[in-house]
């Protein structure tokens, strides 16, 4: 038998809220690896 045959689930990264969309406090705007995009004024960054 082979030792391959495994695959991880997709990580669903990317932009979650686009310009003009209404957001509430706590909404996720972008999911990314590292800090490719930095938050602007009055926007926090978790983890």
UniProtKB/Swiss-Prot annotation:
Cell compartment(s), UniProt: Plastid, Chloroplast
InterPro entries in the record: Ribosomal_bL27, Ribosomal_bL27_CS
UniProt keyword terms in alphabetical order: Chloroplast, Plastid, Ribonucleoprotein, Ribosomal protein
Pfam families, A to Z: Ribosomal_L27
Cross-referenced PROSITE patterns: RIBOSOMAL_L27 (PS00831)
Record-level GO cellular component terms: chloroplast; ribonucleoprotein complex; ribosome
Membrane-spanning segments: none
Region annotated Disordered, chain positions: 1-21
GO biological process, one term: translation
Signal peptide (from-to): none
Keyword Glycoprotein recorded: no
GO molecular function: structural constituent of ribosome
Annotated family: Belongs to the bacterial ribosomal protein bL27 family.
Protein name: Large ribosomal subunit protein bL27c
Source organism of the structure: Porphyridium purpureum (Red alga)
Taxon lineage: Eukaryota, Rhodophyta, Bangiophyceae, Porphyridiales, Porphyridiaceae
């Amino acid at each position: 038998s082979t030792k391959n045959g495994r695959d991880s689930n997709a990580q669903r990264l990317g932009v979650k809220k686009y310009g003009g969309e209404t957001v509430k406090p706590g909404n996720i705007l972008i999911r990314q690896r590292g800090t490719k995009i930095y938050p602007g004024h009055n926007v926090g960054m978790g983890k």
